[in-house]
């Protein structure tokens, strides 16, 4: 029965806190986010430092990433996609690297006074912040293009749908945040449980599966963000 005690002892998402201005912040989330941003910046700098007409090495990878993100934005946003490609690309890269960091970086080897390090996206505060930022962005996109006429979409095609259309603006960030948080947290929890039971062999395929699903989650989030922006920009 000892293995049952091992499973019950598995914890994901423990926190240590920093106090700033009377507010309690999850310190490890900030540390992990800075590490992720540092990795993204380092990748961008090293792969674009010596650009050549015929790309090779890291420049090939950088151009592939840029073209991939641009295609997502073009497909989802439409005619005005170039203006919103940087935002969609930033979301995609931050979520993608955050998710992969949880699977590839041995965070547990770094000891903290309290809590543990892990992927920023396994914290609900991170995913909610990303979802709210997405909501604010598509509101801004609609208001920038249409002005106050943007709010006319809430009574289209009939004013009876006003409550449903308003409710939709609340469900979008909820679905974005909980989908990402739930998938990443569940993946880390399953791997942690299996590692406690069979430390070497069985968890390895699940780690590769986690890498795949982590990439898919980043793609889904970025695609939906682009779709929401495109919806805000299109005519009634």
From Swiss-Prot:
Keywords: ATP synthesis, CF(0), Chloroplast, Hydrogen ion transport, Ion transport, Membrane, Plastid, Thylakoid, Transmembrane, Transmembrane helix, Transport. Pfam families: ATP-synt_A. InterPro entries: ATP_syn_F0_a_bact/chloroplast, ATP_synth_F0_asu, ATP_synth_F0_asu_AS, F0_ATP_A_sf. It is found in: Plastid, Chloroplast thylakoid membrane. The chain crosses the membrane at residues 25-45, 87-107, 123-143, 180-202, 210-230. F-type ATPases have 2 components, CF(1) - the catalytic core - and CF(0) - the membrane proton channel. CF(1) has five subunits: alpha(3), beta(3), gamma(1), delta(1), epsilon(1). CF(0) has four main subunits: a, b, b' and c. Key component of the proton channel; it plays a direct role in the translocation of protons across the membrane. This is ATP synthase subunit a, chloroplastic. It comes from Ostreococcus tauri.
